[in-house]
């Protein structure tokens, strides 16, 4: 359907299809925020820097034609191989860009659209912007149903794209051309809003995409979305400062909001001025350099003994840009002091008020600097400082022991792989991971040296995120070496975007650890009475269980077949050489290493705090009975902070 041209088309309007108008509009959207340091000029960048796409009948003649006609100067196009992976790549780009620049993703209708759901959930949970443009069924319904349409007997206006509603921060379906104008503006508002941002979905019926309309020229004017830095309320700030001054054992928890706000320097200034120790969530790690005296490492179930011991005795917890997930709070068992109080600095009121806290609803950088000024002259007791610094030194010795590999001729453990990588990377390298046993080891062991070096997606902990995210990070930071760390389980979930990295000439590096199964869940299964059932990649044994020989799968050959250069490392010595070569490589390179597993050789220190994974309330197998007894003992320590 094409809307008839009107005489006004010659006076301040432009005749374009809906898809062409959307692409043109996106090419003129910008964000602006002040610089990362005082006195720096505001930085302006494209809000939507590029569009990923896989084309089918639901978008090829609409968005596809519009991208072709507009050209890369208006909207660069990136070709993906899997729709979920395209969202992961866009999310990696947005995170590396401090949420100031994002990417769009276009798909066809049907399975291409539903493949977006997992990536959308990841983006929304992590508060990272991505614009989703799935094709949709005909608005005019000339034939009903069309190819790949879901028929819902009780609702004719439902399509599979409605699956995206609960995982989107804004959802709209464009049934008419003129509806695009308010919808597109609302979409940009949400993407640029540090409180509301996440996945934004504009579902585009395939007939509407191709419909021509006379658009007002003002719709295509350059538009700047300014990202604010709201300051904390004066009364709340004074109350927070009083709480800090009264505390004897305060602890700061740095979350991802510190990075999103570029507040690392402000956090360091507060720690330097007051001596308050700083622990970090997975998203916040690297907010202080690992060698800063106040940095006590990761906190919670995957945290260090230093941070977790401080949390157990803290009488005041200052959360900065954190959501307090169960991994951070050890499932509500970590903050054990009977009188513990909370001060939460967060740009989102929803998060600032958690745990009955004194809420500082503000930008992290603005709030930290205001709190530092309010606390002028205040420092914690020297004995408290000396105690946590001594504990930090003891933990560093444990990290050294986990990294140590004195015999270069042996096959490495996972922690020795991390030690070898630690010795090779520089301050500007980026390390990406999301799932498996690596997040726990990295949170405890990795020595983060710069902002945005440590890139862990642990809001959704999505297997398959790492490789496409590495592509997005490399696009956002072309001068930084980017490493995706994956086990064989994660690799098998989503290796397809290796082809995209090869096509784009992006020199990402993959460290592929082969341990023949799901190591993390295998360990969790053993701890909860499951006896590692169903977690190994092995042939069936005589009893029908997967306990036979390892499967003869060559993942290194698979990576090579997709276009990567592959370096095989059988020993610690070969691993060090391969990592050095990979870092210098100018094309996609994979380092493949088979590791000794944690149940056969010592690795990273065990978990320092609990995580609530309910165990069978009744069972006949002794392992489950014993695991339930331990579960009941741990669960008794849970508490609500009121």
Over which residues does each language-model region extend?
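Short amphipathic alpha-helical interaction patches enriched in hydrophobic/aromatic residues
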Residues: 168-171, 403, 563-566
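Pocket-edge structural micro-motifs
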Residues: 79, 204, 280, 433-435, ...
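N-terminal alpha/beta PP-like core and its mobile active-site loop of ThDP/TPP-dependent enzymes
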Residues: 2-379, 383, 420, 424-427, ...
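Conserved structured core elements
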Residues: 16, 20, 45, 261-264, ...
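Glycine-rich beta-strand-to-loop/alpha-helix junction loops that act as flexible
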Residues: 254-256, 320, 435, 486-489
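Active-site diphosphate/adenylate-binding microenvironment
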Residues: 51-63, 392-469, 473, 479
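Thiamine diphosphate
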Residues: 141-154, 352-353, 361, 368-369, ...
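Phosphate/pyrophosphate-binding active-site segments
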Residues: 2-4, 10, 175-178, 216, ...
């Amino acid at each position: 359907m094409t809307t008839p041209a009107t005489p006004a088309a010659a006076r301040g309007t432009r005749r374009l299809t809906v898809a062409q108008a959307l692409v043109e509009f996106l090419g003129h959207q910008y964000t602006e925020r002040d610089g990362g340091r005082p006195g720096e000029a505001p930085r302006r960048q494209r809000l939507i820097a590029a569009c990923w796409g896989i084309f089918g009948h639901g978008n090829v003649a609409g968005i596809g034609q519009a991208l072709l006609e507009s050209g890369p100067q208006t909207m660069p196009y990136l070709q993906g191989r899997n729709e979920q992976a395209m969202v992961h790549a866009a999310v990696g780009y947005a995170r590396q860009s401090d949420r100031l620049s994002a990417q769009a993703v276009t798909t066809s209708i049907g399975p291409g659209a539903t493949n977006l759901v997992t990536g959308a959930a990841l983006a929304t949970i992590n508060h990272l912007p991505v614009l989703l443009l799935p094709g949709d069924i005909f608005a005019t319904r000339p034939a009903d149903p069309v190819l790949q349409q879901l028929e819902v007997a009780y609702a004719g206006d439902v399509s599979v794209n409605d699956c995206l509603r609960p995982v989107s921060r804004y959802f709209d379906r464009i049934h008419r051309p003129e509806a695009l104008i308010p919808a597109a503006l609302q979409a940009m508002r949400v993407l640029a809003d540090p409180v509301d941002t996440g996945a934004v979905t504009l579902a585009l019926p395939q007939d509407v995409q191709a419909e021509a309309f006379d658009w007002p020229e003002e719709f295509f004017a350059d538009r700047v979305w300014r990202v604010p830095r709201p300051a904390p309320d004066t009364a709340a700030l004074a109350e927070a400062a009083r709480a800090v001054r009264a505390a004897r054992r305060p602890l700061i928890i740095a979350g991802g909001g510190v990075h999103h706000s570029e507040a690392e320097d402000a956090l360091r200034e507060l720690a330097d001025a007051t001596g308050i120790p700083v622990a970090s969530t997975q998203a916040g790690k690297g907010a202080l350099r690992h060698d800063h005296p106040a940095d006590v490492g990761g906190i919670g179930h995957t945290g260090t003994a230093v941070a977790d011991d401080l949390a157990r005795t803290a009488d005041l917890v200052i959360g900065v840009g954190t959501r307090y997930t169960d991994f951070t709070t050890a499932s509500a068992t970590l903050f054990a002091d009977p009188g513990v109080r909370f001060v939460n600095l967060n740009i989102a009121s929803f998060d600032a008020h958690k745990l009955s806290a004194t809420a500082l609803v503000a930008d992290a950088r603005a709030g930290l600097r205001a709190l530092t000024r309010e606390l002028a002259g205040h420092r914690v007791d020297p004995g408290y400082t000396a105690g946590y610094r001594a504990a930090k030194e003891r933990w560093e010795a444990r990290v050294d022991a986990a990294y140590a590999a004195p015999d270069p001729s042996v096959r490495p453990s996972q922690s020795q792989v991390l030690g070898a990588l630690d010795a090779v990377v520089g301050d500007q390298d980026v390390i990406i991971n999301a799932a498996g046993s690596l997040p726990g080891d990295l949170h405890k062991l990795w020595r983060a040296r710069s902002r945005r070096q440590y890139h862990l997606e642990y809001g959704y902990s999505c297997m398959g995120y790492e490789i496409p995210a590495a592509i997005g990070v490399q696009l956002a930071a072309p001068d930084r070496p980017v490493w995706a760390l994956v086990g064989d389980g994660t690799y098998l979930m989503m290796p397809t975007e290796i082809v995209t990295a090869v096509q784009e000439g992006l020199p990402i590096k993959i460290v592929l650890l082969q341990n023949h199964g799901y190591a993390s869940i295998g360990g969790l299964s053993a701890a909860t009475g499951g006896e590692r059932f169903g977690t190994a990649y092995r042939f069936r044994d005589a009893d029908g269980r997967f306990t036979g020989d390892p499967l003869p799968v060559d993942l290194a050959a698979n990576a090579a077949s997709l276009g990567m250069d592959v370096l095989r490392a059988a020993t610690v010595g070969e691993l060090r050489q391969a990592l050095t070569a990979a870092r210098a490589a100018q094309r996609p390179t994979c380092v493949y290493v088979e590791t000794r597993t944690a149940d056969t050789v010592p690795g990273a220190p065990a978990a320092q705090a609990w995580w609530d994974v309910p165990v069978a309330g009744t069972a006949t197998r002794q392992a489950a009975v014993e695991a339930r007894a331990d579960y009941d003992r741990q669960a008794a320590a849970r508490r609500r902070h009121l």
